[in-house]
Every structure is written in C-alpha cells, then in structure tokens.
Regions:
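Generic recognition of well-ordered alpha-helical segments
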Residues: 30, 75, 90-93
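Alpha-helical DNA-recognition elements
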Residues: 45, 49
Length: 126
C-alpha cells in the first residue's frame, strides 16, 4: 500500500538514504519507491533543491564504463535531517494518537455518539 507523500517527506527520505551511504539517483529512487509511488521527474528536482540548499553535494564516479552522479550528505544536510526527523516523529505521534483515541472511543462507544452529534450539527447548519 502506498500513501501520498509530500516533497518534504521525500527530502527527509533522501537525506536519510544518503546519510547511510553515498547513493546515485536511480538507487535513491528505487529505495523510495519501496514505500511511495514517485517518478524520477519528481525526484530529480528535489535532489537539485537539496544540492542548491547545501544539504547534499555531488560527485561523479565510473561504474561499468558509465559515469554515475553520486549524492553525499553535508553537515548542513545532517542538521536538516535531524530537524525533519523531529517533525516526522511529531507527525507520526499525532497520527498514532488519533488512531489510538479512535480505537479507545470505539471500544467505549464514544465515537458513535460524537459522530451523531457531528451529523446533527452539520444538518442544523444547512
């Protein structure tokens, strides 16, 4: 199952990938495609943006007679990755709280009551 991902989340994934080891574009895209349905036409502008911001640097290396462009994280990129990791944790915790709250309230029958109240309030506005 794929969930929609924002450009910011893709940036976070890219920085996380190149933090582990220098990687080339296709390799990065294949790793991200394990969890998100993205196209190279989406990925490369984000890589360029990260390079322009100073979060990654690039270098070329030959592999089986062909040149590959590798991306390497910078210290600024590590700082940005840590920031995005904090944002991701906060986002994930919020989603988990909503899901857990819903489960608990379903067990207690509260969600059903809240749903009815919301429907009634919506009907009154019409």
């Amino acid at each position: 199952m794929y969930f929609p991902v924002s450009a910011l989340l893709i940036e976070f994934m890219i920085l996380s990938i190149v933090n582990r080891e220098d990687s080339y574009g296709y390799e990065i895209s294949q790793t991200i495609k394990l969890v998100a349905d993205i196209k190279e036409s989406t990925l490369y502008p984000i890589l360029k943006k990260l390079e322009k911001a100073g979060y990654v640097t690039t270098y070329s290396a030959e592999y089986q007679g062909r040149k590959r462009k590798y991306y390497s994280i910078t210290e600024a990129g590590k700082t940005q990755m840590a920031y995005l990791q904090g944002e991701w944790k906060s986002y994930r915790d919020t989603i988990d709280d909503i899901i857990e709250w819903r489960k608990k309230n379903d067990e207690w029958g509260i969600s059903e009551t809240i749903g009815k109240v919301s429907e009634e309030a919506s009907a009154e506005r019409l």
